[in-house]
Each structure stands twice: as structure tokens, then as C-alpha cells.
Amino acid sequence: MALTKEQTQHLYHKLLDMQKELSGEKKETESMTEEVGELSNGVDNHMADHGTLVTDRMTDQTVKEIDRELLEEVNRALQKMKDGTYGVCEKTGQEIPYERLEAVPYARMTVEAQADVEDDLETDAPSYEREFHEQVKDLSNKETIDQKSSQTYEILDREQDSK
């Protein structure tokens, strides 16, 4: 069943909100990166501080890349709405159920088609490529970032206590 006008409007506004949020986060992350850069300029920090700064910068870059890709997906979905092709699976041509679009408004495929693509990626991709995709998923998960950060601090504390 095709999306109703109300459903389409709801999803359109949801995509616009995501677009604004992702654009706003980009500016916030850029200013945070500048602050980190200022902290490291001309100040002789402890080696652990340098390691933390490098890790923070790498995490920021990865998060920026994920946000950039997500913003592209959101923009693509908005363009599909204008073109009249929104909600149609790119792989099968079937309509994407409203429930899926409600959960993932920028979805380009049905759940089944997406699972097939991901299965193909897992079987076709070299192991290092799968590991990279898993790392990106981990880095996009705030709980994982917090956990890795706390583990890093625990290790640094133990190293400093042992001296």
C-alpha cells in the first residue's frame, strides 16, 4: 500500500529535522576540534595527553565521516520525495513498509533486501574490510565510545600509579 499524504508529510518533516540536526552537529564538532587543537598548540602535555588527543581526533574524524554519509542519505531521501520515488526499494522495486520508513526514514531498501546486501558484503568483503565496518559501527555507538574511553583512562591510571 502506498504511503498516505499524512505519512509522507510526517516522514518529510522527520527527514528535515535530521538534516538540521546533522548540519548543526557538524558545526559543533568542528568547534570542538578547534578547541582540542588549541589545547595542543604550544603546550608541552604529558605523553598520555597526546595519546588521548590523537584518539579524540581520530574518533571525531570517524564520527564526522559517519555524519556526512548519513546527511547524504537524508538528502538523497528528500530528493526521492521530490522525484516521487521515495519509499520504493532500490533493489526489488517493492514498496518499503511505512513502519520501516518510520524507523529509518532514509531507508533505500526493504529489510529483506538490506539483509541480502549485508550478507553479500560479509561473504564478499575481505576480513579487514569487515573489521573496518564493525569498527565504524562501534564508533557510531555512543556506549562503545564511552566504554573505550573509560578503559583508556583506567589503563593510563594504572600506568601512572605503577610509576
Curated annotation (Swiss-Prot):
Compositionally biased residues, Basic and acidic residues: 19-30, 127-146
Gene3D superfamilies, sorted: DksA, coiled-coil domain
Chain segments carrying region Disordered: 19-55, 115-163
One Pfam family linked to the record: zf-dskA_traR
MF annotations from Gene Ontology: zinc ion binding
Induction remark: By heat shock, salt stress, oxidative stress, glucose limitation and oxygen limitation.
Taxonomy, superkingdom: Bacteria
UniProt keyword annotation of Zinc present: yes
Keywords: Metal-binding, Stress response, Zinc, Zinc-finger
InterPro entries in alphabetical order: DnaK_N, Znf_DskA_TraR, Znf_DskA_TraR_CS
Zinc fingers (dksA C4-type) by residue: 89-123
Protein's recorded name: General stress protein 16O
Source organism per UniProt: Bacillus subtilis (strain 168)
Gene: yocK
